[in-house]
A protein has these predicted regions:
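Active-site proximal loop and beta-alpha junction motif in alpha/beta enzyme cores
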Residues: 1-132, 144-179
Length: 179
């Protein structure tokens, strides 16, 4: 949308429900969005009880999901790092994780497959929307979770069913999304 508006400026501010984001046009067809800093505490995500949000275990349909990383990047996310992100039927397990009692405001669910330290492929269940072909906040949440778990560098490409986003994390955990 921004690229087609013939703006005199290459930078604007975008107001969301709970954040003010800086956006700037980079190159001919891309926009970099400063997403801000993630929130990590059980209260800020939020979780219904105080636990380690960087190592969550859930049981869904007799399947045990371990090592879930919960983070709020403007909305709440849980990321599970798995061998094959498309192995899991998100249409079945996505809504069950989204509506789990641990998540009082529901949660976005990402199955993430680390290809290498610069590339991650994801399969995303977005709360209230279902399985999606792409999700910017899921890309940011996945990148910060991978970086904190030392699975990826502070700059990583997140690949979706359709397209990809480049995510950079600076020294203060500020997240930049380009696509």
């Amino acid at each position: 949308y921004l690229l087609g508006q013939n703006l005199n400026t290459k930078e604007i501010k975008l107001k969301t429900n709970n954040r003010l984001l800086n956006a700037r046009i980079v190159g001919n067809l891309e926009v970099e969005l400063e997403m801000g800093k993630p929130l990590y505490s059980s209260e800020e995500i939020p979780l219904s009880k105080t636990i380690n949000p960087a190592n969550v275990t859930l049981e869904v349909d007799k399947n045990k999901f371990t090592g879930g990383f919960c983070v709020n990047v403007g909305n709440p996310h849980i990321i599970f790092f798995v061998k094959d992100c498309f192995e899991y039927d998100l249409k079945t397990i996505g809504p069950k994780i989204e509506n789990h009692s641990l998540f009082p405001e529901k949660i976005n669910v990402t199955m993430a497959q680390v290809i290498d330290e610069n590339n991650i492929t994801v399969n995303v269940w977005e709360r209230g929307a279902g399985q999606t072909k792409a999700c910017g906040t899921a890309a940011c949440a996945t990148a910060i979770a991978a970086f904190k778990n030392r699975l990826a560098h502070n700059e990583v490409d997140i690949k979706f069913k359709e397209g990809f986003l480049n995510i950079k994390i600076d020294k203060t955990d500020n997240i930049f999304m380009t696509g």
